[in-house]
């Protein structure tokens, strides 16, 4: 995730791409919204390309075709008009000052090592601004980490809740805790992937 401050629309490439998308993207998207029927027909024909792009920018480990299609339908179910408004809004977003509201609260920031849209450096900014926050970076995980590794994400959230309850019970100031950054591998998920590869062989 990201608190903003620029560089959110470069698709993991370069600042030049981000600037180009920020300038040209909204206009193109608003125009596409006027020819929705044509775009829908093109999407049907170009589904393999659409799925490949969604897979590339959403996940960093092999996932099922059904999950890729679910993510694609969710993303492209948004109107192009809304996307056109979204691009400049997210480029100008800067919520770093708002993070002070989380001070004194148990916070865990989770993101994927392979997230091309909001890489770990974006999350590190959040962690640096919230004393005592924990940063969990998951190997083999992309931008849609909550769909790619649902059990692991749920586990980390539950652990954060338990830490918060324990800190309150023991009267420990959360903001005095040292910052923790952990890199985690979802072993269960990795084994599933390996078994699937073996079945294909």
Spans of features found by a protein language model:
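Conserved alpha/beta-hydrolase catalytic His-Asp/Glu region
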Residues: 33-101
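Short beta-strand/loop motif that positions the catalytic acidic residue
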Residues: 102-103, 109-111, 115
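Residue-level signal for the nucleotide or nucleotide-sugar donor/cofactor binding architecture
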Residues: 78, 118, 148
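Proline-centered loop/turn at the N-terminus of a beta-strand
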Residues: 105-106, 134
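Acidic catalytic loop of the alpha/beta-hydrolase fold
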Residues: 90, 113-118
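Short alpha-helix in the alpha/beta-hydrolase fold that links the catalytic acid
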Residues: 88, 105, 119-128
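Flexible "cap/lid" loop of the alpha/beta hydrolase fold
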Residues: 1-38
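Catalytic active-site module of serine/aspartate enzymes centered on a nucleophile-bearing elbow/loop
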Residues: 124, 130-201
């Amino acid at each position: 995730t990201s608190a903003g401050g620029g560089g959110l629309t470069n698709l993991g490439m370069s600042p030049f791409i981000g600037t180009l998308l920020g300038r040209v993207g909204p206009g193109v998207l608003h125009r596409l919204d006027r020819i929705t029927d044509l775009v829908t027909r093109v999407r049907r024909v170009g589904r393999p390309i659409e799925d490949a792009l969604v897979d590339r920018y959403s996940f960093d480990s092999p996932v099922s075709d059904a999950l890729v299609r679910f993510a694609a339908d969710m993303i492209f179910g948004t109107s192009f008009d809304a996307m056109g408004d979204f691009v400049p809004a997210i480029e100008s977003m800067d919520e770093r000052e708002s993070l002070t509201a989380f001070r004194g609260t148990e916070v865990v920031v989770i993101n994927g090592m392979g997230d091309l849209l909001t890489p770990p450096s974006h999350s590190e900014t959040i962690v640096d601004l919230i004393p005592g926050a924990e940063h969990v970076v998951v190997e083999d995980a992309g931008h849609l980490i909550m769909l790619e590794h649902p059990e692991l994400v749920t586990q980390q959230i539950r652990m954060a809740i338990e830490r918060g309850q324990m800190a309150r019970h023991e009267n420990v100031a959360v903001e005095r805790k040292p910052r923790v950054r952990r890199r985690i591998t979802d072993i269960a998920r990795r084994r599933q992937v390996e078994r699937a590869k073996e079945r294909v062989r």
